[in-house]
Design a protein with these regions (language model features):
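Alpha-helical transmembrane segments and membrane-interface helix-loop junctions
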Residues: 1-179
Length: 179
């Protein structure tokens, strides 16, 4: 179990770093958005590249923020049945849901989005707007984000198996109370 927990810790550490970058991107996206608006109104100047950069940052936040949010156990969940279960039952439900729904869905979506990225990469797809950005890097974020979420799912399954066997303790409840 120790080697598996080491893998889980490595995945968690990677997603912590991704989460840190995503947190910085929130600030950067706000600054770019505010600067864009001020320049547009103060100088009557607008750049498609800066506008596209805003939605590139938002796409990165959404796709990579999902794995960080899952690591922190802050995804939305319907707790009607979950709260009625014992802690062990909650661990089992988390593990089964992750194994049979989350991981297969993420891997399928990564697989299906890969050709979308490859086509853009192979043709060197550019924005249709004057001064716009190249498109293939942001299209890579789609399969990469799903792979990272699937990897975090693997980490969560490892932790739950370890908890069920008594190697670790996991607080299966939300980090914050239900709002």
């Amino acid at each position: 179990m120790r080697p598996l927990l080491a893998v889980s810790n490595a995945i968690d550490a990677l997603n912590e770093k991704i989460g840190y970058v995503c947190n910085l991107l929130v600030l950067l996206a706000c600054l770019v958005s505010a600067a864009n608006a001020m320049i547009r109104y103060a100088f009557s100047y607008s750049s498609n590249g800066w506008l596209e950069l805003q939605w590139y940052m938002f796409a990165i936040l959404v796709m990579f923020g999902a794995s960080y949010t899952f690591k922190r156990n802050e995804h939305v969940r319907v707790e009607i049945m979950y709260l009625m279960l014992s802690e062990r039952g909650q661990l089992w439900l988390d593990m089964i849901g992750t194994l049979f729904f989350l991981i297969p869905s993420c891997l399928l979506l990564a697989y299906l989005s890969w050709p979308f990225f490859m086509q853009a990469y192979n043709v060197g797809e550019m924005s249709g707007n004057a001064g716009g950005l190249i498109r293939w890097p942001i299209k890579f974020v789609i399969p990469a984000g799903f792979v990272m979420l699937a990897l975090q799912g693997v980490s969560e399954v490892i932790k739950r198996i370890a908890a069920l066997q008594g190697y670790v303790t996991i607080d299966a409840k939300y980090e914050r109370p239900t709002q």
